[in-house]
């Protein structure tokens, strides 16, 4: 079908949608109908007729005019859409939707008569920034915590400790208690689901169990049985247990403790690739300092981009939101797969729907950040030159092993993404006002509990000591 025969008008719609109204001449409608009859006659099997030799009148009688018209209309719409976007140089990013609905259009479709219909599709948005200069951003500082070095070393000592039986004394903090216990709710006497064990190793450290449990075990002797009263915290994961009082019948069946290795150069050699304890400390200190600096830089950049996003004007198309949500879902699945989980059985249709829905806010935020930076590059004409890209690629290749398999195009794109990101952030740094603020007290406690700095440092450290944290 010739695209020149179409009449096409376009109209922008909210959420980066484009309405494309197409008027198809009667001749094309008739041709589509005749093509549908020919196609169906070749594919249908009717008793007494060879395939492709079914008379027209018999075919219409057997299939009905509606089915033939529907087949013709489907093909007509597909061809008209393809020709219209080519004729008008349109770039949709989603499949089109028929505004009036197929059934309504089918009623008005007559072979040989002109037909007008409107299709809507998502198109790439045009992001704009209200302003680019003079932005104000505030970010949280990240301080190097020297106490983490000692904590990491102590954790490594625990990993390398020898577990030995305890004799002649009661249980105390830091011991490993072998417990048998049974828990019931105080209010109705019902058993606590998952609140019983015949023999379970429990580290006697505060925070390991619900409040009151560890404290109740401290001071017990092997063979002793004791009733301990506890209370579930209000934020306990299991909803029906929150805030409820409980009673546990506890028997201390055995008691063990850890004999930690001496904190000396020999320990450093066994726990890491360092020769001395001093070298181990120095290595951990530097890695934690580097990590704190990286996280502070990340906080600074996040604050600048957040300030830029506030100036962004863009309507996100649904197609991009869905695609970004799928990207996040695939990342989650990949993480689970790396942990050895069976992703196919885990990701049920219901779970996928929930994850897609829950990831939508993050998907939208990521898109806004991306569009804000794209708009900044456009507004301020921030570009890359080939020499800088080539130089960076050579630098990256030097750090890779000789036998590493590299996709040149993917490497170049990754390098370009990093370089343009650096240039955009550098421009924002120079043209914005940035102030520091100390982390909130509660956030500091949460950070200390989660130990993200240590975990990141340990993951990159060559030492076994920090890798075991």
Curated annotation (Swiss-Prot):
Superkingdom as given in the UniProt entry: Bacteria
GO cellular component terms given for this protein: cytoplasm
Keyword Cell cycle: yes
GO biological process, one term: chaperone-mediated protein folding
Pfam families per UniProt: FKBP_C, Trigger_C, Trigger_N
Catalytic activity, as annotated: [protein]-peptidylproline (omega=180) = [protein]-peptidylproline (omega=0)
InterPro entries reported in the protein's UniProt record: PPIase_dom_sf, PPIase_FKBP_dom, Trig_fac, Trigger_fac_C, Trigger_fac_C_sf, Trigger_fac_ribosome-bd_bac, Trigger_fac_ribosome-bd_sf, Trigger_fact/SurA_dom_sf
TM helices/strands, residue ranges: none
UniProt entry tagged with the keyword Zinc-finger: no
Molecular function as annotated in GO: peptidyl-prolyl cis-trans isomerase activity; protein folding chaperone; ribosome binding
Localization: Cytoplasm
Primary localisation category: cytoplasm
Keywords: Cell cycle, Cell division, Chaperone, Cytoplasm, Isomerase, Rotamase
Function according to Swiss-Prot or TrEMBL: Involved in protein export. Acts as a chaperone by maintaining the newly synthesized protein in an open conformation. Functions as a peptidyl-prolyl cis-trans isomerase.
The family this protein is said to belong to: Belongs to the FKBP-type PPIase family. Tig subfamily.
UniProt free text on domains: Consists of 3 domains; the N-terminus binds the ribosome, the middle domain has PPIase activity, while the C-terminus has intrinsic chaperone activity on its own.
Protein's UniProt name: Trigger factor
Organism listed in the record: Synechococcus sp. (strain CC9605)
The encoding gene: tig
